[in-house]
Amino acid sequence: MNPYSVKLDTFEGPLDLLLHLINQAEVDIYDIPVALITEQYMAYIHTMQELQLDVASEYLVMAATLLQIKSKMLLPKQEEIFDETFEYEEEDPREELMFRLIEYRRYKEAAQELKEKEGERSQVHTRLPDNLDDYLTEEERQRQSIQGVTLFDMLAAYQKLLKRRAYSRPRTSTVKVEEYSIDERMTDILMDLEKCNGKCRFQDLFVEKGRGHMVVTFLAMLELMKTDAIYCEQNENFADIWIYRREGKNRDIERASSSH
């Protein structure tokens, strides 16, 4: 046997080493020359052992697998049996290994593509935004305080109230048909906030548990937020939402509501 020169590259596992040997030999992965690849693989393992490198057990398991496949390939093939009712085709001992290598190659190529994209992205540098707080008006500063509260946060809080109402209501109840005005409820909310020193929790505005009243209250709150009469704050996710009353526009809203 000619001496085999092994270059000690870094491989991530036995499949990585096998794929390297197949590519190096320029052979078809669907028709692996087991004898050649096994010889090169074993030479690589022996070289690692001679250099007293730690050989992981998974490499030795693959070596045993290759030797087993090689021995099966050396066995004389059984004659194919054909008749009208039965057809026998001998299984290729390389098939399972071939599928594992194809799957591994697919993941390896995908990982390489992601690595290249990461390299391209690392060449893009962004700068931090300038701090423009000094140029904000007082009203804009107040608006910044609601940046953590979105319509989705409000809807989530409202859905939570509906669930509590569903659990707390009696199994049988009398349905009362009542009409609620959004304008009137807007005025009521502003008055409630004034009584509470200008702030209260979201759920505290839903004192009545009737479905109609809850819907009107929620819509009135959205209208008040739209007109900047109130604003909301939430210190962290899933924490209570606090409603704050703004000064200035509230009187105009109250007068407009009372005129309807």
From Swiss-Prot:
Keywords: Cell cycle, Cell division, Chromosome partition, Cytoplasm. The keyword Methyltransferase does not apply. This is Segregation and condensation protein A. InterPro entries: ScpA (IPR003768), ScpA-like_C (IPR023093). One of its GO terms (cellular component) is cytoplasm. Belongs to the ScpA family. It is found in: Cytoplasm. It holds the Pfam family SMC_ScpA. The gene is scpA. GO terms for biological process: cell division; chromosome segregation; DNA replication. Component of a cohesin-like complex composed of ScpA, ScpB and the Smc homodimer, in which ScpA and ScpB bind to the head domain of Smc. The presence of the three proteins is required for the association of the complex with DNA. Participates in chromosomal partition during cell division. May act via the formation of a condensin-like complex containing Smc and ScpB that pull DNA away from mid-cell into both cell halves. The keyword Cell division applies. Its main location: cytoplasm. It comes from the Bacteria.
